């Protein structure tokens, strides 16, 4: 009682898949504040490091953009070495007084690595080369795992179909899908 509650921001499903040396990362476009849709076509992914890395974010947009800028600086500082840049960002994110207050997660793919970077200092490399973050991530992840295991679909097709499935289930995910490929 007496405490102001901040509106819960839920706005994203981001999914990345690597298959046969090709990587794809996509997201829906919905941004919500509480139970209201604010925007249908928010762009939550971008290409980094001379087009060799794609990243997407879930969480507060301003926080995520700040983290993306920092991640890009780390990639430049470490010559595009994805894991090293991710670990250094996670370390800074966790220990810096300003950064540790940022509320976002990053999903990152290159042609041979898929990582999730969190503000708690985690850098997670899933065993199946699928990364998923955001409100509908578990629906998209389940769909992607099944499609990867049981179909010959490309990475891009798996991302597209899985995000469509998540959009059919998760009220915080829509079907305005943007996908980038490597």
Curated annotation (Swiss-Prot):
Binding site residues for Na(+): 167, 170, 173
InterPro entries hit by this protein: ATP-dep_Prtase_HsIV_su, Ntn_hydrolases_N, Proteasome_sua/b, Proteasome_suB-type
Gene Ontology molecular function: metal ion binding; threonine-type endopeptidase activity
Gene Ontology BP, a term: proteolysis involved in protein catabolic process
A Pfam family: Proteasome
Active-site residues per Swiss-Prot or TrEMBL entry: 12
Entry EC number(s): 3.4.25.2
Regulation: Allosterically activated by HslU binding.
Signal peptide: none
Record keyword Secreted present: no
Record field: catalytic activity: ATP-dependent cleavage of peptide bonds with broad specificity
SUPFAM superfamilies in alphabetical order: N-terminal nucleophile aminohydrolases (Ntn hydrolases)
Location(s), subcellular: Cytoplasm
Keywords, sorted A to Z: Allosteric enzyme, Cytoplasm, Hydrolase, Metal-binding, Protease, Sodium, Threonine protease
GO cellular component, one term: proteasome core complex
NCBIfam families per the UniProt record, alphabetical: ATP_dep_HslV, PRK05456.1
Family named by the database record: Belongs to the peptidase T1B family. HslV subfamily.
Self-association and partners: A double ring-shaped homohexamer of HslV is capped on each side by a ring-shaped HslU homohexamer. The assembly of the HslU/HslV complex is dependent on binding of ATP.
Function: Protease subunit of a proteasome-like degradation complex believed to be a general protein degrading machinery.
Name of the featured protein: ATP-dependent protease subunit HslV
Gene from which the chain derives: hslV
């Amino acid at each position: 009682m007496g405490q102001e509650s901040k509106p819960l921001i839920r706005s994203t499903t981001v999914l990345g898949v690597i298959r046969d040396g090709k990587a794809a990362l996509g997201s829906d476009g919905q941004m919500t504040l509480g139970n209201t849709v604010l925007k249908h076509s928010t762009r939550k992914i971008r290409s980094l490091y001379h087009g060799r890395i794609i990243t997407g974010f879930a969480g507060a947009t301003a926080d995520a953009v700040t983290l993306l800028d920092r991640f890009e600086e780390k990639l430049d500082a470490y010559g595009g070495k994805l894991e090293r840049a991710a670990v250094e960002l996670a370390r800074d994110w966790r220990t810096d007084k300003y950064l540790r207050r940022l509320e976002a997660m990053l999903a990152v793919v290159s042609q041979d690595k898929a990582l999730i970077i969190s503000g708690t200092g985690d850098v997670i490399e899933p065993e199946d080369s699928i990364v998923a973050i955001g409100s509908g991530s578990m629906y998209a992840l389940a769909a992607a795992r099944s499609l990867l295991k049981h179909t010959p679909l490309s990475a891009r097709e798996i991302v597209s179909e899985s995000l469509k499935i998540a959009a059919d289930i998760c009220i915080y995910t829509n079907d305005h899908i943007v996908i980038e490929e490597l």
